[in-house]
Curated annotation (Swiss-Prot):
Induction behaviour: By sucrose in the dark. Down-regulated by starvation.
Gene (UniProt): ACP2
Protein name: Acyl carrier protein 2, chloroplastic
O-(pantetheine 4'-phosphoryl)serine carried by residues: 91
Major localisation: plastid
Keywords: Chloroplast, Fatty acid biosynthesis, Fatty acid metabolism, Lipid biosynthesis, Lipid metabolism, Phosphopantetheine, Phosphoprotein, Plastid, Transit peptide
Modifications the protein undergoes after translation, according to the UniProt entry: 4'-phosphopantetheine is transferred from CoA to a specific serine of apo-ACP by acpS. This modification is essential for activity because fatty acids are bound in thioester linkage to the sulfhydryl of the prosthetic group.
Organism: Arabidopsis thaliana
Subcellular location per the Swiss-Prot or TrEMBL entry: Plastid, Chloroplast
Length: 136
């Protein structure tokens, strides 16, 4: 009966610790009632992702401001990954945290940027970005 052949290229991006694979020369054959699909696989180089973490000193200062603004005890653990909401902060508390950070670091945060922070790490990264821009 009829035979069909096609060629295509498919690329899958790798996640951490996984391989990227490309499928090329995809072929489909039909022989009466049975059909089969075959393709060749080859490994692609993995893509690197660069992420930048805030300086530990900045994170520590942010933690201190958050602790002060929310009246938290020293026993209450605050890390870079801590979400303000997990500490019981509502939207008003978050505004007060931002105001405290602006005062502590001598910066001004745009409202849309301030609304995007939800964790200590995000706040510290934004502060470092603003300090870098201010130093230019």
């Amino acid at each position: 009966m009829a035979s069909i052949a096609a060629s295509a290229s498919i690329s899958l991006q790798a996640r951490p610790r996984q391989l990227a694979i490309a499928a090329s020369q995809v072929k489909s054959f039909s022989n009466g009632r049975r059909s089969s699909l075959s393709f060749n696989l080859r490994q692609l180089p993995t893509r690197l992702t660069v992420s930048c973490a805030a300086k530990p000193e900045t994170v520590d200062k942010v933690c201190a401001v958050v602790r002060k603004q929310l009246s938290l005890k020293e026993a209450d653990e605050i890390t870079a990954a801590t979400k303000f909401a997990a500490l019981g902060a509502d939207s008003l508390d978050t505004v007060e945290i931002v105001m405290g950070l602006e005062e502590e670091f001598g910066i001004e945060m745009a409202e849309e940027k301030a609304q995007s922070i939800a964790t200590v790490e995000q706040a510290a990264a934004l502060i470092e970005e603003l300090l870098f821009e201010k130093a230019k």
